[in-house]
């Protein structure tokens, strides 16, 4: 999604943000964006690990059923 944004594009976005929000608000906005990104990453990581746990649980159940049947 953002792979096409280069250095000039990032500089342009930063300058526009500086004009809109002013220099005093930029650190606060940066911290908020960083926290949001961190929460998003941890949420996606927990979703992925939850899926892996479900797959392992299903495999263990299948193995137990095969062992009990055989």
From Swiss-Prot:
Segments forming a coiled coil: none
GO cellular component, one term: TAT protein transport complex
GO BP annotations, alphabetical order: protein transport by the Tat complex
TM segment ranges: 1-21
Topology with respect to the bilayer: Single-pass membrane protein
GO molecular function annotations of the record: protein transmembrane transporter activity
Subcellular localization(s) per the UniProt record: Cell membrane; Cytoplasm, Cytosol
Induction context: Expressed under conditions of phosphate starvation.
Quaternary structure annotation from Swiss-Prot or TrEMBL: Forms a complex with TatCd. Two types of complexes exist: one composed of TatAd and TatCd, and another composed only of TatAd. Soluble TatAd forms homomultimers bigger than 100 kDa. Soluble TatAd associates in homomultimeric micelle-like particles with a size of about 12 or 25 nm in diameter as well as in elongated particles of 12 nm in diameter.
Protein family membership: Belongs to the TatA/E family.
PANTHER family membership: SEC-INDEPENDENT PROTEIN TRANSLOCASE PROTEIN TATA (PTHR42982:SF1)
Entry function: Part of the twin-arginine translocation (Tat) system that transports large folded proteins containing a characteristic twin-arginine motif in their signal peptide across membranes. TatA could form the protein-conducting channel of the Tat system. Required for PhoD secretion. The cytosolic fraction of TatAd binds the precursor of PhoD.
Name this polypeptide is given: Sec-independent protein translocase protein TatAd
GN (gene name): tatAd
């Amino acid at each position: 999604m953002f792979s096409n944004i280069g250095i000039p594009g990032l500089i342009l976005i930063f300058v526009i943000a500086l004009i809109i929000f002013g220099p005093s608000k930029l650190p606060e906005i940066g911290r908020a964006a960083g926290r949001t990104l961190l929460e998003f990453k941890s949420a996606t990581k927990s979703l992925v690990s939850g899926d892996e746990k479900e797959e392992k649980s299903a495999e263990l159940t299948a193995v137990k059923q095969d062992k009990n049947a055989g």
